[in-house]
Amino acid sequence: MGRGRVQLKRIENKINRQVTFSKRRAGLFKKAHEISVLCDAEVALVVFSHKGKLFEYSTDPCMEKILERYERYSYAERQLIAPESDVNTNWSMEYNRLKAKIELLERNQRHYLGEDLQAMSPKELQNLEQQLDTALKHIRSRKNQLMYESINELQRKEKAIQEQNSMLSKQIKERENVLRAQQEQWDEQNHGHNMPPPPPPQQHQIQHPYMLSHQPSPFLNMGGLYQEEDQMAMRRNDLDLSLEPVYNCNLGSFAA
């Protein structure tokens, strides 16, 4: 007796329903992989559980490429067959399309951050790992490039500073040489001017004979001879003139 046809209906037991979902999902993904390998077809499979968890399978490492291709194809086909009265409907579909795309991007972002990985299959985890490795390679390459450019810029600035320092040192040495030469020249000039100057000429003071006649008369002793100290016996004025005649004249007047 052959096996009867099993009636499909919702499994009421939650545990049995979850177990059946896991088994059927694995079988479905296996069939999708087989058809992609045997027939060289691009397959994208998206499954949501009763709790809202997303399960997907794609032959391309990036699911978005297949979805974008599907969206372009279906949107272009709808545009060809849709009448003008369905413009509002098209806008609604466009909104739903963009909303689904945003949700997909948010989910991928969570995966890149290491979140919501429990529902991913080994192949999905492998694809995610490859994407992260590729991203890390690009990040390291860009970081090394920036570091290399920064080092080159610092070396260029260092070279410019060294050249500027060399130029300043050269200018300072030239200035020191000029100042040293000027100092030597000044020292030579000052040495020539510091020699003892010749004595200034004596200024001769000429006294008027009237002033000489009114000079105090020498002291006379009554009844004696004129006596005068030896140092005053001969006086000479600034004109080297002997005062002896004047004194003799004065003595003659007193004798009279």
Curated annotation (Swiss-Prot):
Location, primary (coarse class): nucleus
Compartments where located: Nucleus
Name of protein: Floral homeotic protein APETALA 1
Gene Ontology molecular-function annotations: DNA-binding transcription factor activity; protein dimerization activity; RNA polymerase II transcription regulatory region sequence-specific DNA binding
Cellular component GO terms, alphabetical: nucleus
Keyword NAD appears in the UniProt entry: no
GO biological process, one term: cell differentiation
Annotated source species: Brassica oleracea (Wild cabbage)
Function: Transcription factor that promotes early floral meristem identity in synergy with LEAFY. Displays a redundant function with CAULIFLOWER in the up-regulation of LEAFY. Required subsequently for the transition of an inflorescence meristem into a floral meristem, and for the normal development of sepals and petals in flowers. Regulates positively B class homeotic proteins.
Subunit structure: Homodimer capable of binding to CArG-box sequences.
Segments of this protein annotated with the region Disordered: 187-206
K-box domain: residues covered: 88-178
Organism taxonomic ancestry: Eukaryota, Viridiplantae, Streptophyta, Embryophyta, Tracheophyta
Keywords from the UniProt entry: Activator, Coiled coil, Developmental protein, Differentiation, DNA-binding, Flowering, Nucleus, Transcription, Transcription regulation
Sequence ranges assigned to domain MADS-box in this UniProt record: 1-61
Gene giving rise to this polypeptide: AP1
